[in-house]
């Protein structure tokens, strides 16, 4: 007996070990998740959605398991029949244990599958359903609050489809069980007949819910003149669904009565009625649409088109747009420009795409440092608002030498990036490079507002794995010449590496080194989920996060700001987003309701509600109390850096191309469809991206930080309007549309691009530069509204066709009305346009040169030719050597010499005209 007892204990131990081996990693992952959520202060959030998933999964598992088990148990209660030699039929005695196992095993697997699927699909919908917030907007057909469609309809649909699917699976299990036990015999079909009727009754009762859901979903119909329910949908299809629902009730009754009375005729009455309604309804739909609606579509569909216009504008927040007339034909003077110095001083002369290349070439310092992207923002510097580009210097562990990518280096030593680079958008050096206001390692600056005192970046866009800090291995901080500075983490983030936690993380990360490394001690802490996007998505998986976070310098600290969105595809009558490249493809309601901040040093993560009108985010706030803070609770230093979401603005401007038309007749006939204005970038025609400008809105003296995007008529290039999103203080989020008078013609960006290409002097220079291994980049064309007029500004970059090239700003093109000039600086261009020596406090000079052709107005024809040849040879040599600063200087000299040649007379004392002409005709770069 003692042996048996010991054997039992051994078996129990083996069973425990087996469970740990199989489920240990999952248990460890759950435990480490809980530890992490507790560490960052969001344990209630984790427990809430974990419990919700478990509760939903358990409830569905129980329902599906019991339904499947008992129906299968019924299928096994009939004993199989066997014929003996005299054709006598006998029943094989049933084995109760065996039949229960036959019913139990498939039911158990189906229940587990149903519970898992339902927990994933339903937990969020159920929580929102229980805590739903009214939208205070009703649909124009049924008069239901929009919240019904956000919360109720989504839940009902999911439950309906899951119920139908699992009912069908249970039905198939019953068929298979019967045929397995009885074989394909007459008796098996007889036994299944009654059961089929019961399942049919269940299905037709489910179909009642399906028809009612179909009726509600008519508000998203896409087969009419517009998105949403149209004339045929509401006059024919909706009544058909209601009649079909009644027919389903009748069908269930006739099936049940027919079964009891064993009357096939009675049982068939309901199905025949249901099929008849659906057939007649389908014919009626086609008849009404083709013979009543289509011949007079605009008159029949007009009220529904109005519904579509109104609800689409509400769904995307476009109903809040303020429209302002903007003539755009005002006359600007130099005095006007000097009154608008805040605008002039913030005109963006450097483009973000070449700028990121320059940052990585000049400021990465080491191969393992990388600038991921460049973001634009504004800072108050010396009492004035200044636009800047800012980019974080992150550490990319994958760029370490392969031999250096050891476990110690990746997880204990190379733990963080360092600092950031800041450059004003309107200043360039004499080499055409961005002027650095914050640069180097450690970061240095002469601008007090941009001082960085905590430059370490433990949480960023490239921090994709955990690190363990405060170990016996000092952390690499930053390079200092031939040596490296070292540091120890002093922040609050991290989970203490106790022995138990070490074991959990070793199991979770499948790495024994975490448990056994002697470099990890009781003071060590593990930092998890350091990628800021992964971090916020793990905390709030129900939000959609912008993939372009931006960095803010906050009193010396570095803080990431991330836009978070709520969205739905259930806004009645609202057109859906058709751009497949959009993160909201297929949705028809989007709000940038939340701003998230993540401290780059300690990972502190906070969620702020910035749109209180959004019922979705208000419901999430009820579901997860303590997760969201109000906008008033956001620190002022962060709040003044909030920007209107470019992603949302792109969605809104794309929708507004058509939905600015409020008249249903104009909308139906597409009489006034707009397009996003086009521009040339490099050599490619593309839609203009939204861009930020500093300007005073008409009627206001205050300069604001605005996000704008111009519109043109579809298939035309003149500009008809521009939409602005305000960003500052109490005006944050307000949209203003500036419309040009229909009777006036304002140059659109594509027309200005064409004028630049057709200008003989400009095109000649661009063609000369765009040869022999060099490339001209025509940067973003900026449309700058100033007072009641428009300036168009396009920086010109020059670069080489190799990976180490540094793009340089070599010219600025400015267009105003019918005038267009190209100069080395914005000041020079404005001076040429407005006839005065205009000097802004803005951009620095691009490459300037001094050469004889500039100063000597009395050179002879032969001297001018010689200057051209000399400048050409020097420019060609500089291009071959990749010396683009000198190249720009000699190209300036070449331009001046060519201009000087035009002023001289070929009848001067030249005896080499033919030779000179031959040589000049062979000049190409």
Segment roles from a protein language model:
Residues 2-13:
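N-terminal membrane topogenic signal
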Residues 13-16, 22-881, 885-909, 913-925:
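Soluble extracytoplasmic regions of secretory-pathway and membrane proteins
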């Amino acid at each position: 007996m003692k042996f048996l007892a010991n054997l039992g204990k051994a078996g129990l131990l083996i069973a425990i070990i087996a469970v740990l081996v199989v489920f240990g990693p999952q248990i460890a992952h759950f435990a480490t998740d809980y530890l992490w959520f507790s560490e960052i202060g969001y344990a209630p959030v984790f427990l809430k959605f974990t419990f919700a998933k478990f509760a939903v999964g358990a409830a569905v598992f129980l329902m599906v398991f019991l339904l499947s088990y008992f129906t299968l148990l019924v299928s096994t209660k009939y004993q199989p029949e066997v014929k003996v030699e005299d054709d006598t039929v006998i029943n094989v005695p049933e084995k109760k244990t065996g039949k229960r196992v036959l019913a139990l095993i498939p039911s158990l697997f189906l229940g587990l599958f149903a519970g898992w699927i339902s927990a994933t699909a339903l937990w969020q919908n159920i929580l929102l359903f229980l805590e739903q917030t009214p939208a205070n907007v009703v649909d124009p057909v049924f008069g239901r609050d929009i919240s019904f469609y956000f919360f109720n309809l989504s839940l009902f649909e999911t439950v309906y489809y899951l119920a139908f699917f699992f009912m069908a699976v249970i039905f198939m299990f019953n068929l298979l069980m019967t045929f397995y036990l009885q074989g394909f015999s007459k008796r098996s079909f007889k036994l299944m007949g009654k059961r089929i009727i019961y399942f049919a009754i269940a299905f037709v009762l489910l179909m009642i819910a399906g028809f009612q859901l179909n009726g509600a979903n008519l508000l998203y119909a896409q087969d009419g003149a517009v998105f949403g329910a149209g004339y045929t949908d509401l006059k024919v299809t909706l009544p058909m669904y209601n009649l079909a629902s009644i027919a389903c009730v009748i069908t269930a009754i006739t099936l049940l009565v027919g079964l009891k009375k064993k009357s096939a005729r009675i049982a068939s009455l309901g199905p025949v009625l249901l099929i008849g309604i659906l057939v007649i309804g389908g014919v009626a739909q086609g008849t009404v649409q083709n013979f009543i609606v289509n011949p007079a579509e605009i008159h029949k569909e007009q009220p529904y088109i109005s519904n579509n216009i109104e609800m689409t504008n509400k769904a995307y927040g476009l109903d809040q747009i303020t429209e302002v007339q903007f003539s755009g034909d005002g006359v600007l003077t130099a005095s006007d420009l000097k009154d608008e110095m805040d605008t002039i001083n913030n005109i963006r002369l450097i483009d973000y795409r070449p700028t990121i290349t320059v940052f990585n070439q000049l400021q990465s310092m080491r191969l393992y440092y990388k600038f991921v992207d460049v973001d634009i923002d504004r800072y108050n510097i010396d009492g004035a608002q200044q636009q800047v580009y800012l980019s974080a210097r992150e550490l990319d562990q994958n760029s370490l030498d392969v031999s250096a990518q050891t476990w110690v280096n990746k997880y204990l030593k190379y733990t963080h990036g360092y600092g950031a680079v800041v450059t004003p958008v309107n200043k360039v050096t004499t080499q055409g490079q961005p002027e650095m206001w914050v640069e180097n390692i450690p970061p240095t600056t002469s601008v007090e507002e941009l001082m960085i005192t905590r430059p370490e970046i433990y949480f960023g866009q490239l921090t994709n794995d955990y690190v363990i800090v405060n170990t016996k291995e000092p952390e690499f901080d930053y390079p200092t010449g031939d040596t490296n500075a070292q540091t120890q983490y002093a922040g609050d983030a991290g989970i203490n590496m106790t022995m138990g936690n070490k074991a959990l993380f070793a199991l979770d990360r499948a790495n024994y080194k975490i448990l056994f490394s002697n470099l990890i001690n009781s003071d060590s802490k593990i930092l998890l989920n350091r990628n800021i996007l992964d971090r916020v998505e793990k905390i709030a998986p129900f939000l959609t996060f912008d993939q372009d976070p931006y960095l803010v310098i906050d009193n010396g600290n570095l803080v990431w700001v991330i836009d978070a969105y709520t969205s739905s595809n259930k806004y009645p009558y609202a057109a859906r987003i058709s751009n497949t490249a959009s993160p909201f493809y297929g949705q028809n309601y989007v709000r940038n309701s939340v701003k998230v901040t993540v401290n780059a040093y300690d990972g502190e993560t906070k969620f702020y509600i910035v749109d209180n009108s959004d019922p979705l985010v208000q419901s999430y706030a009820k579901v997860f109390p303590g997760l969201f803070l109000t906008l008033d609770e956001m620190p002022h230093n962060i709040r003044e850096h909030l920007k209107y979401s470019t992603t949302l603005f792109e969605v809104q401007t794309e929708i507004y191309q058509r939905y600015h038309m409020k008249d249903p007749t104009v909308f139906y006939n597409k009489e006034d469809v707009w397009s996003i204005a086009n521009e040339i970038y490099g050599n490619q025609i593309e839609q203009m991206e939204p861009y930020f400008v500093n300007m005073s809105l008409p009627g206001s003296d205050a300069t604001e930080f605005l996000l704008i995007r111009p519109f043109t008529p579809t298939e035309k290039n003149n500009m008809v309007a521009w939409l602005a999103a305000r960003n500052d203080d109490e005006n944050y989020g307000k949209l203003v549309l500036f419309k040009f008078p229909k009777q006036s013609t304002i140059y659109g960006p594509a027309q200005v691009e064409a004028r630049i290409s057709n200008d003989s002097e400009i095109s000649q220079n661009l063609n000369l530069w765009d040869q022999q291994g060099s490339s001209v980049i025509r940067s973003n064309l900026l449309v700058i509204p100033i007072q009641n007029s428009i300036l168009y500004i396009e920086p010109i970059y020059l670069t080489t066709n190799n990976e180490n090239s540094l793009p340089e700003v070599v010219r600025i093109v400015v267009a105003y009305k019918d005038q267009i000039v190209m100069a080395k600086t914005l000041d020079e261009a404005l001076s040429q346009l407005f006839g005065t020596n205009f000097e802004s406090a803005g951009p620095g000079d691009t490459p300037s040169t001094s050469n004889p052709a500039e100063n000597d107005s009395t050179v002879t024809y032969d001297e001018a030719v010689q200057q051209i040849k000399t400048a050409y040879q020097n420019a060609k040599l500089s291009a071959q050597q990749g010396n683009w600063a000198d190249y720009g200087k000699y190209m300036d000299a070449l331009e001046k010499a060519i201009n000087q040649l035009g002023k001289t007379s070929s009848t001067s004392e030249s005896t080499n005209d033919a030779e000179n002409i031959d040589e000049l005709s062979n000049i190409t770069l």
